[in-house]
């Protein structure tokens, strides 16, 4: 009786786990397309205080990590981790660039002038100051998306088959290559071409490990 009962149960459990792995709708990381026309050096953005327009050409020869950020997201704790990544990878010519966006759950509601104060005193709080460049708040999806994100998204496959619940997403039209949520990341190589794209929930330590593995591979080629 016991063996007759457990046999089908174990088989069902095995099939459920197998199905879950097979139908996993997301990947922690995807490689970007090879031979994409153009580079990020054709684009630029205004710094968060609006005081300077930065042409991304000035990062030529470096690796750039583009991140869309938000101050009131469950992933806002990622900010200190990005500080650590920037500090530890700076010797390897890696620069983190942050782009505040309010299109995901309306989680970046403040003005540009309020964002740094919110980070310092509210979330993450505790006097936090980002050690990487932040740019003006803007769209990363939809009709008014920043052109650099149009380029990045067209250069890399999406990390997830699912776009998310429409009631929490604020742009139109919605496209398959769109960014899914706050804190998605794109790595651009020293030639200005996109290299990798990470799912927003991929831990920063994994992102850092992936970058280091990539840097080690490029040194040996």
From Swiss-Prot:
It comes from the Eukaryota. Keywords: Oxidoreductase, Peroxidase, Secreted, Signal. It is found in: Secreted. Residues 1-19 form the signal peptide. GO terms for molecular function: glutathione peroxidase activity. SUPFAM superfamilies: Thioredoxin-like. Its main location: secreted. The active site is at residue 73. Pfam families: GSHPx. Its EC number is 1.11.1.9. One of its GO terms (cellular component) is extracellular region. One of its GO terms (biological process) is response to oxidative stress. Expressed in the Bowman glands. The keyword Oxidoreductase applies. It is an enzyme of class 1 (oxidoreductase). PROSITE patterns: GLUTATHIONE_PEROXID_1 (PS00460), GLUTATHIONE_PEROXID_2 (PS00763), GLUTATHIONE_PEROXID_3 (PS51355). It catalyses: 2 glutathione + H2O2 = glutathione disulfide + 2 H2O. Belongs to the glutathione peroxidase family. This is Glutathione peroxidase 6. It comes from Rattus norvegicus.
